[in-house]
Amino acid sequence: MDQGLSLNTLPLKELRNLIRNNQFTGSTTGCAAGYLQANLVILPAEWATDFLLFCQKNPVACPLIDVTQPGEKYLQSIGRDIDLSTDVPEYHVFYDGEFETAVSDLSTLWREDLVTFVLGCSFSFEEALIQSGLSIRNIDEGKNVSMYDTSIPCQSSGKFSGNYVVSMRPFTSIDAIRAIQITTRFPKAHGAPVHFGDPSLIGINDISTPNYGDAVEIKPNEVPVFWGCGVTPQNVIRQSRPPFCITHAPGKMLITDRLSSEFAVLDSRHLLLLPNLIIRAGMRINCDMGESFGLCNR
């Protein structure tokens, strides 16, 4: 199948069948508008408790949707027809923390001791941004979202430690404010941004070269806005070195049967004023950038 084909209007069941039959292996950004998309982390049961606690301690980077019992391939909470071993466009396989290979299904790798964690994804709030009149650059350019390793530390838990990975979308200052307001409603899709403005403040030295995904144009009147990202566990896995782990490939998500709106916590009519919103979201704000938005006073 042509990976450049727009799939926004394709019914979810048809899209899932394409993925299951290895006919679509591309990024799912912009696909199945309005449906919750999810990251996957699959670990041996002996590592599962520590990772569960890691997710609980780091809900922005790893917003937990659900977790399976060992060996289970299905989760009724996210979809009656979803097979966790076939319904992701591409999986990444790690041994001792090192990436080994990419596969399109897990039939030869599945084990009865494997526990699957389903984590929320920022692709889930894309439709809300678009419905509010905002443009998402990577979708407009037909690309995967830009993702970066950072210097922002996660809270450690047992065997697991490491730094955030973030996704980036550029906006004008006015649109950035609106994007912050909208995405705060979706904590299970990473919620409000963790940073905007100068990327070097979070350890990104070259914004034109993402660690994952694709580079997009950032116009002179735009600022980069950074959200927590479900690729964070892959960064953590490289440091924590479990003997075996499977994840989704960055930008190639599990699309669930649940609507993103089911996980919204705040009606858009009742959004707080931005200064209070930022305080409550605990955002990292570059005050120089904040001054240009009228948010910071020295």
Curated annotation (Swiss-Prot):
<dbReference type="GO" id="GO:0016829">
    <property type="term" value="F:lyase activity"/>
</dbReference>
<dbReference type="Pfam" id="PF07286">
    <property type="entry name" value="D-Glu_cyclase"/>
</dbReference>
<protein>
    <recommendedName>
        <fullName>Putative hydro-lyase VFMJ11_1458</fullName>
        <ecNumber>4.2.1.-</ecNumber>
    </recommendedName>
</protein>
<comment type="similarity">
    <text>Belongs to the D-glutamate cyclase family.</text>
</comment>
<dbReference type="InterPro" id="IPR016938">
    <property type="entry name" value="UPF0317"/>
</dbReference>
<dbReference type="InterPro" id="IPR009906">
    <property type="entry name" value="D-Glu_cyclase"/>
</dbReference>
<keyword id="KW-0456">Lyase</keyword>
<dbReference type="InterPro" id="IPR038021">
    <property type="entry name" value="Putative_hydro-lyase"/>
</dbReference>
